[in-house]
From Swiss-Prot:
GO terms for cellular component: bacterial nucleoid; cytosol. It comes from Vibrio vulnificus (strain CMCP6). Belongs to the YbaB/EbfC family. InterPro entries: YbaB-like_sf, YbaB/EbfC. Homodimer. It is found in: Cytoplasm, Nucleoid. Keywords: Cytoplasm, DNA-binding. This is Nucleoid-associated protein VV1_2004. GO terms for molecular function: DNA binding. Its main location: cytoplasm.
Amino acid sequence: MFGKGGMGNLMKQAQQMQERMQKLQEEIAXMEVVGESGAGLVKVTITGSHSVRRVNIDESLMEDDKEMLEDLIAAAFNDAARRVEETQKEKMAAITGGMQLPPGMKMPF
């Protein structure tokens, strides 16, 4: 069915892919991504594991409406989270040869 050495090679490839996936997960968890809203007036920096590192708010917003500022912070966080997801997909495609994850399946596994 697998030919001479076929099963052994298949297992070796699976192990190598698993090692690359583990390294990728560690790399993604350590990376930082910046999300923005309000044309860059609010910036949120998060890690690949979605931990917030920094929130930067332009001074000009300090005098504005509190509710608007809260909305901008939420939008900046959502932008950063979206960027993390995009980066994960790009890095994952490099390992899997472009094979996409099934819908709803996210890293880490």
